[in-house]
Amino acid sequence: MFTYATTVSTLTSTAILAYLTRHYDPEHKFSFDDDLDVSRAEQWMAWQHGGLGPMQGQANHFNRFAKERIAYGMQRYTGETERLVGILDKQLKSNDYLVGNKYSIADIANFGWVHMLRFSGVELDDFPSLKAWWERVLARPAVQRGLSIPSKGPFGNDAYLQRLKDDEEFAKTERELREKIKAAKEQYGYKYSSP
Protein backbone atom coordinates (compact mmCIF):
# COMPACT_ATOMS: atom_id res chain seq x y z
CA MET A 1 0.00 0.00 0.00
CA PHE A 2 1.21 3.49 -0.87
CA THR A 3 -0.08 6.35 1.27
CA TYR A 4 0.33 9.64 -0.56
CA ALA A 5 -1.88 11.88 1.53
CA THR A 6 -3.12 11.83 5.08
CA THR A 7 -6.59 10.67 4.03
CA VAL A 8 -6.05 8.67 0.83
CA SER A 9 -4.23 5.41 0.19
CA THR A 10 -3.72 3.45 -3.01
CA LEU A 11 -3.09 -0.25 -3.32
CA THR A 12 -2.03 -2.49 -6.18
CA SER A 13 1.15 -1.81 -8.07
CA THR A 14 -0.74 -0.68 -11.17
CA ALA A 15 -2.64 2.08 -9.37
CA ILE A 16 0.49 3.14 -7.48
CA LEU A 17 2.54 3.41 -10.69
CA ALA A 18 -0.24 5.37 -12.39
CA TYR A 19 -0.49 7.77 -9.45
CA LEU A 20 3.27 8.29 -9.24
CA THR A 21 3.60 9.07 -12.94
CA ARG A 22 0.60 11.43 -12.97
CA HIS A 23 1.94 13.41 -10.03
CA TYR A 24 5.73 13.05 -10.22
CA ASP A 25 6.61 12.50 -13.88
CA PRO A 26 5.55 15.71 -15.67
CA GLU A 27 8.43 15.33 -18.14
CA HIS A 28 7.28 11.79 -19.03
CA LYS A 29 10.61 10.12 -18.29
CA PHE A 30 8.78 6.89 -17.39
CA SER A 31 5.34 7.63 -18.80
CA PHE A 32 3.96 9.01 -22.06
CA ASP A 33 2.21 12.10 -23.35
CA ASP A 34 0.95 10.41 -26.51
CA ASP A 35 -2.54 8.95 -25.93
CA LEU A 36 -1.80 5.77 -27.86
CA ASP A 37 1.37 5.10 -25.88
CA VAL A 38 -0.47 5.87 -22.62
CA SER A 39 -3.05 3.23 -23.59
CA ARG A 40 -0.34 0.74 -24.57
CA ALA A 41 1.43 1.23 -21.23
CA GLU A 42 -1.86 0.79 -19.35
CA GLN A 43 -2.50 -2.36 -21.38
CA TRP A 44 0.83 -3.95 -20.38
CA MET A 45 0.33 -2.94 -16.75
CA ALA A 46 -3.18 -4.43 -16.68
CA TRP A 47 -1.93 -7.51 -18.54
CA GLN A 48 0.68 -8.09 -15.83
CA HIS A 49 -1.79 -7.37 -13.04
CA GLY A 50 -4.47 -9.72 -14.36
CA GLY A 51 -2.34 -12.32 -16.15
CA LEU A 52 1.35 -12.77 -15.50
CA GLY A 53 1.28 -11.88 -11.80
CA PRO A 54 -1.57 -14.20 -10.80
CA MET A 55 -0.47 -17.12 -13.00
CA GLN A 56 3.19 -16.94 -11.96
CA GLY A 57 2.10 -16.52 -8.36
CA GLN A 58 0.12 -19.75 -8.65
CA ALA A 59 3.10 -21.48 -10.30
CA ASN A 60 5.18 -20.41 -7.30
CA HIS A 61 2.53 -21.79 -4.96
CA PHE A 62 2.11 -25.19 -6.62
CA ASN A 63 5.83 -25.64 -7.39
CA ARG A 64 7.26 -24.31 -4.14
CA PHE A 65 4.86 -23.87 -1.27
CA ALA A 66 1.91 -26.29 -1.51
CA LYS A 67 2.06 -28.97 1.17
CA GLU A 68 1.49 -31.60 -1.49
CA ARG A 69 2.75 -31.59 -5.07
CA ILE A 70 -0.35 -31.56 -7.27
CA ALA A 71 0.66 -32.39 -10.83
CA TYR A 72 -2.32 -30.66 -12.45
CA GLY A 73 -1.64 -27.36 -10.66
CA MET A 74 2.08 -27.55 -11.36
CA GLN A 75 1.66 -28.05 -15.09
CA ARG A 76 -1.32 -25.70 -15.40
CA TYR A 77 0.29 -22.65 -13.86
CA THR A 78 3.85 -23.28 -15.03
CA GLY A 79 2.47 -23.74 -18.54
CA GLU A 80 0.34 -20.62 -18.33
CA THR A 81 3.35 -18.65 -17.10
CA GLU A 82 5.34 -19.94 -20.09
CA ARG A 83 2.54 -18.89 -22.44
CA LEU A 84 2.41 -15.41 -20.94
CA VAL A 85 6.16 -14.83 -20.99
CA GLY A 86 6.06 -16.05 -24.59
CA ILE A 87 3.80 -13.06 -25.30
CA LEU A 88 6.36 -10.74 -23.68
CA ASP A 89 9.15 -12.41 -25.66
CA LYS A 90 7.26 -11.85 -28.91
CA GLN A 91 6.63 -8.17 -28.08
CA LEU A 92 10.32 -7.69 -27.29
CA LYS A 93 11.62 -9.36 -30.47
CA SER A 94 11.31 -6.05 -32.32
CA ASN A 95 11.35 -3.63 -29.36
CA ASP A 96 13.92 -2.88 -26.69
CA TYR A 97 11.14 -2.04 -24.23
CA LEU A 98 7.43 -2.84 -24.00
CA VAL A 99 6.09 0.56 -25.13
CA GLY A 100 7.44 3.48 -27.13
CA ASN A 101 10.95 2.05 -27.29
CA LYS A 102 11.85 3.53 -23.91
CA TYR A 103 12.02 2.24 -20.35
CA SER A 104 8.64 3.03 -18.81
CA ILE A 105 6.08 2.12 -16.19
CA ALA A 106 5.07 -0.83 -18.38
CA ASP A 107 8.56 -2.29 -17.97
CA ILE A 108 8.61 -1.48 -14.26
CA ALA A 109 5.28 -3.29 -13.77
CA ASN A 110 6.48 -6.46 -15.49
CA PHE A 111 10.12 -6.61 -14.43
CA GLY A 112 9.60 -8.00 -10.92
CA TRP A 113 7.83 -11.09 -12.21
CA VAL A 114 10.37 -11.72 -14.95
CA HIS A 115 13.14 -11.18 -12.40
CA MET A 116 11.80 -14.20 -10.46
CA LEU A 117 10.95 -16.35 -13.48
CA ARG A 118 13.42 -19.16 -12.85
CA PHE A 119 12.19 -19.50 -9.27
CA SER A 120 8.75 -20.21 -10.77
CA GLY A 121 10.01 -23.20 -12.74
CA VAL A 122 10.28 -21.43 -16.09
CA GLU A 123 13.66 -21.13 -17.82
CA LEU A 124 14.43 -17.55 -18.88
CA ASP A 125 16.98 -18.80 -21.44
CA ASP A 126 14.07 -20.27 -23.47
CA PHE A 127 12.90 -16.71 -24.20
CA PRO A 128 15.90 -14.88 -25.72
CA SER A 129 14.26 -11.51 -26.38
CA LEU A 130 12.78 -11.46 -22.90
CA LYS A 131 16.15 -12.41 -21.41
CA ALA A 132 17.87 -9.55 -23.29
CA TRP A 133 15.19 -7.13 -21.98
CA TRP A 134 15.63 -8.46 -18.42
CA GLU A 135 19.40 -7.91 -18.71
CA ARG A 136 18.86 -4.33 -20.02
CA VAL A 137 16.48 -3.46 -17.20
CA LEU A 138 18.61 -5.21 -14.57
CA ALA A 139 21.67 -3.19 -15.67
CA ARG A 140 19.97 0.11 -14.80
CA PRO A 141 21.58 1.60 -11.67
CA ALA A 142 18.21 2.63 -10.22
CA VAL A 143 16.89 -0.92 -10.65
CA GLN A 144 19.97 -2.26 -8.86
CA ARG A 145 19.38 0.19 -6.01
CA GLY A 146 15.71 -0.81 -5.82
CA LEU A 147 16.51 -4.51 -5.73
CA SER A 148 18.84 -3.97 -2.78
CA ILE A 149 16.11 -2.46 -0.58
CA PRO A 150 15.92 -3.77 2.08
CA SER A 151 18.41 -6.33 0.71
CA LYS A 152 18.83 -8.36 -2.45
CA GLY A 153 16.44 -11.28 -2.28
CA PRO A 154 17.14 -14.94 -3.01
CA PHE A 155 14.50 -15.31 -5.73
CA GLY A 156 15.89 -13.18 -8.57
CA ASN A 157 17.18 -14.95 -11.67
CA ASP A 158 20.78 -13.93 -10.96
CA ALA A 159 20.65 -15.02 -7.30
CA TYR A 160 18.92 -18.25 -8.31
CA LEU A 161 21.65 -19.14 -10.82
CA GLN A 162 24.39 -18.31 -8.33
CA ARG A 163 22.77 -20.51 -5.71
CA LEU A 164 22.59 -23.37 -8.23
CA LYS A 165 26.36 -23.07 -8.66
CA ASP A 166 27.20 -22.66 -4.98
CA ASP A 167 24.80 -25.05 -3.25
CA GLU A 168 24.79 -28.63 -4.51
CA GLU A 169 21.86 -29.61 -2.28
CA PHE A 170 19.79 -26.73 -3.67
CA ALA A 171 20.81 -27.70 -7.22
CA LYS A 172 19.72 -31.29 -6.57
CA THR A 173 16.36 -30.15 -5.19
CA GLU A 174 15.88 -27.89 -8.22
CA ARG A 175 16.67 -30.70 -10.67
CA GLU A 176 14.09 -32.86 -8.89
CA LEU A 177 11.52 -30.05 -9.05
CA ARG A 178 12.14 -29.53 -12.79
CA GLU A 179 11.66 -33.27 -13.33
CA LYS A 180 8.35 -33.17 -11.42
CA ILE A 181 7.17 -30.23 -13.51
CA LYS A 182 8.21 -32.04 -16.70
CA ALA A 183 6.40 -35.21 -15.59
CA ALA A 184 3.27 -33.21 -14.71
CA LYS A 185 3.28 -31.62 -18.17
CA GLU A 186 3.64 -35.03 -19.80
CA GLN A 187 0.87 -36.48 -17.62
CA TYR A 188 -1.58 -33.80 -18.74
CA GLY A 189 -0.35 -33.49 -22.33
CA TYR A 190 0.93 -29.94 -21.97
CA LYS A 191 2.90 -28.66 -24.96
CA TYR A 192 4.25 -25.11 -25.06
CA SER A 193 3.57 -23.27 -28.27
CA SER A 194 4.86 -19.78 -28.79
CA PRO A 195 2.29 -17.07 -29.50
Q: How does the language model describe each region?
A:
Residues 150-195:
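Acidic/histidine-enriched, glycine/proline-rich intrinsically disordered or flexible terminal extensions
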Residues 51, 56-60, 98-126, 131-137:
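GST superfamily/GST-like fold recognition
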Residues 16, 41, 88, 107, ...:
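Residue-level signal for nonpolar/aromatic packing positions in well-ordered secondary structure
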Residues 23, 80-83, 87-91, 136:
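Solvent-exposed, charged/polar functional surfaces in cytosolic regulatory/catalytic domains
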Residues 1-75, 79-82, 177-195:
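GST-like domain detector, emphasizing the conserved glutathione-binding G-site
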Residues 11, 45-47, 77, 85, ...:
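Tryptophan-centric aromatic hotspots in well-structured domains and transmembrane helices
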Residues 116, 120-166:
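A contiguous, mid-protein "functional segment" used to position or interact
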Residues 26-27, 90-102, 142-146:
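Surface-exposed helix-capping loop/turn segments at secondary-structure junctions
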